Amino acid sequence: MTQTNGFDALHAHAQRLRGAAIPALLAAEPERPTQYAWQVGPLYFNFARQKYDRAALDALFAIARERDLAGAFQRLFRGEQVNVTEQRAALHTALRGDLTDAPVASEAYATAAEVRQRMGALIQQLEATDVTDIVSVGIGGSDLGPRLVADALRPVSGARLRVHFVSNVDGAAMQRTLATLDPARTAGILISKTFGTQETLLNGSILHAWLGGSERLYAVSANPERAAKAFDIAPGRVLPMWDWVGGRYSLWSAVGFPIALAIGFERFEQLLEGAAQFDAHALNTPLEENVAVLHGLTAVWNRNLLGSATHAVMTYDQRLALLPAYLQQLVMESLGKRVKLDGSAVDSDTVSVWWGGAGTDVQHSFFQALHQGTSVVPADFIGTVHNDDPYAENHVALMANVLAQTEALANGQDSSDPHRSYPGGRPSTVILLDALTPQALGALISMYEHSVYVQSVMWGINAFDQFGVELGKQLASQLLPALKGESADVADPVTRELLSKLRG
């Protein structure tokens, strides 16, 4: 990005604005509170407290045009091989809508719709049995997305099926889950793109034995033959996924099977509809009015021009408490890259460390550092305008904290006592859902997916591979024999010492 024609001008704006007070920016642009705000379907965004002005934004958009961002969106949606290292398309958008005339994308959409019909039929069959509980086994993209959506949208009471998620290879996770369930009234779903994932295979074996066989086991995999063979699952209970959908983008596919079981098939389809509606915004809206583009460019601005190494996400709706963990994978696995598409080194920093939690709990943990620490941490504050729980006063108090915290972080407060002085200048974006509906959550997740893609295009990196996760898995596999007491050649001296401790 630093090699683009417009970077010097952008850098000059950063030098000008780095020390600017956010109240001064608001005073200089009196219409800023509304001009930097957007309503896209059920989502409202306000960027007024970010540390840029119109001139800086124009410079950002100029670089986005130089990077052919609009063309990059076309290539993504049309099913071109945007995942260049693995020579694949990244057609997660086709799982929820058909927005182009590209045959590849249209075929993917039709294929996904057929599988969704199969999934709906399996759900009807399950609901007609005496099964009351589902154990979903997966990890990473096979777990975080489904777990987030199921937790956010599950009914407070009256659910026909209860869905439990197990991801960690630590046996305690499976033990605690199964201890509360009756094997005679439980079914299991094993989700793995390759069905070679150690955690899923080990946990799947435990679940298979606990259930007494495969009669109530289902699987989702891009390798359905291996899935069926590994646990003797009938082919009719194995749903496919595809190599043109990355794990962290897969909740819209049959990976969403546990979502549909938890919230109902109709509401699962509404989730997809909400995502497709935001997809249309991302694909068809001019850059300057495109919220996904603005969100992604804001992240680039804060990372590369203002030097922020971390980004916080605060969800002021308890039902979205798992969103920060989901976004950690979506953002950091997609953007944690050090080489460009052609294999050359990047010319700027890439991903920030993403983290966060649920408000107001986080105000009593890490907000001290946000307000008075030496690091400036940009943040997203996410809340809901309307809440359907019966405790209206609580919701009012919750939203009062969103307003108060974003104002305090931005404006600060002087004091003669340095211990009680707040420097301010902490930028934030406020995102409000009209209500936490399937459509709104689908749109929100879609927005973050496209924001990630924007950042990858600006940095010239591949958002759709994840080779960085492989080395540790390979070493773990090699060390298993040594941990079991078998002879093994372990070269690393620290690892040898740790092995001796673990083996006693």
Swiss-Prot record:
Isomerase listed as a keyword: yes
Localization (cell): Cytoplasm
Enzyme active site: 333 (proton donor), 364, 473
Keyword set includes Membrane: no
UniProt keyword list: Cytoplasm, Gluconeogenesis, Glycolysis, Isomerase
Pfam families referenced in this protein's UniProt entry, alphabetically: PGI
Main location class: cytoplasm
Any one Gene Ontology BP term: glucose 6-phosphate metabolic process
Pathway: Carbohydrate biosynthesis; gluconeogenesis; Carbohydrate degradation; glycolysis; D-glyceraldehyde 3-phosphate and glycerone phosphate from D-glucose: step 2/4
GO cellular component term of the entry, any: cytosol
GO molecular function: carbohydrate derivative binding; glucose-6-phosphate isomerase activity; monosaccharide binding
Reaction catalysed by this enzyme: alpha-D-glucose 6-phosphate = beta-D-fructose 6-phosphate
NCBIfam families in the record: PRK00179.1 (NF001211)
Family: Belongs to the GPI family.
Protein name from the UniProt record: Glucose-6-phosphate isomerase
Lineage: Bacteria, Pseudomonadati, Pseudomonadota, Gammaproteobacteria, Lysobacterales
Gene behind this protein: pgi
